[in-house]
Amino acid sequence: MSRNQPPKIAIVAGEHSGDLLGAGLMQAIAKRHPNATFIGVGGPLMAERGMDSFFAMDDLAVMGIAEVFQQLPKLLKHRKNLVNYLISEQPDVMIGIDAPDFNLTVEARLKKAGISTIHYVSPSVWAWREGRIKGIKKAVDHVLCLLPFEKDFYDKHQLPATFVGHPLADDIPMQWQQTEARNELELEPAVMYLAILPGSRKGEIARMAPVFLKVANKLAERYPELRFVAPMISEARAAQFRELVDQYSPELNIVLPVGESRKVMAAANYLLLTSGTVALEALLIKRPMVVAYRFHWLSYQIIKRLFHAPFFSLPNLLAGKEIVPELAQSDASEEAIEQALVQLIEQDNEPLLEQFTNIHQQLQVSASEKAADVVESFL
């Protein structure tokens, strides 16, 4: 960047979580460089910060092996056109946010063309397919890690990396009052609630909701005072879930708020959820949880051969030990999930919540500002 020219920064995000990270980073950079320009791919939050997306971010939000194959021609065309566009624009630095299968190739081609590259959100290379580190080193000048143990992995492989903390730890308050959340959601103030979070994607809900609803039926018999609430990401997913409730749990009294997942978790006493970022949100909101997940059978055959981390849920990975029950595939039976939830309901959870607070404090280090510090070093 010439000292007389405002920085031009390329950012490529592939899904909602990346859009959130990108918007926070753009805000932090713009405070230092009000005239900075941003190019690349982003969603609505990044658009609010001035990103004119090269193509729709949703085109990259493809999950599952079968789905990726179906969309492969479009993805390859997007990638080729994006690389050509970014090389022609010559940004001062390119930041790929998550979406490693797409972004690492883009980053490698830009780095070869002499453009500095940063990857924001470490690929889970520490958990499976460790051999990918060779490709990452060829593609990336610096990795921004959300989790503290990830930096140790990159240090071992001599790739510059910075632990920037997790933006969710900055966004979610250290104490989220249950009473306040219930009032805002118009839930009953003095009864016990179990929040059910079966995923945000259509396929996940189809796979997990029937299991979770059958567990809810059994818990309703055991605890007549227990109430149920299931936040949905959209009206379409709420309609899908309602059909499954009618099929599997027609007698169940369950509320389905749309777009209020964090508030619902704060309002609940206990949580039953799938793996992923939602488990980290649950930890930060500090509610006892059971994590259960069933993968598509083909995905599971691949994962079980390549996955080598001791846990699959973020709370346990961050703690370095099992602090929340996690049940996967055949272990995620209705009986096992019910038993884990009963134990959670019957036990004293204060020691668990103290561990959640300790982890929250470790992750709360102003992620967007620390990430912007690294970007600044490349300008």
Swiss-Prot record:
Enzymatic reactions: a lipid X + a UDP-2-N,3-O-bis[(3R)-3-hydroxyacyl]-alpha-D-glucosamine = a lipid A disaccharide + UDP + H(+)
Record EC number: 2.4.1.182
UniProt keywords, alphabetically: Glycosyltransferase, Lipid A biosynthesis, Lipid biosynthesis, Lipid metabolism, Transferase
GO cellular component, one term: membrane
BP term (GO), one: lipid A biosynthetic process
Keyword Lipid biosynthesis among record annotations: yes
Top-rank lineage group of the source organism: Bacteria
Pathway(s): Bacterial outer membrane biogenesis; LPS lipid A biosynthesis
InterPro entries linked to this entry: Glyco_trans_19
A molecular-function term among this protein's GO annotations: lipid-A-disaccharide synthase activity
Residues forming coiled coils: none
Pfam family, one: LpxB
Function: Condensation of UDP-2,3-diacylglucosamine and 2,3-diacylglucosamine-1-phosphate to form lipid A disaccharide, a precursor of lipid A, a phosphorylated glycolipid that anchors the lipopolysaccharide to the outer membrane of the cell.
NCBIfam families recorded: lpxB
Family: Belongs to the LpxB family.
The name this protein goes by in its record: Lipid-A-disaccharide synthase
Species for this entry: Idiomarina loihiensis (strain ATCC BAA-735 / DSM 15497 / L2-TR)
Protein encoded by which gene: lpxB
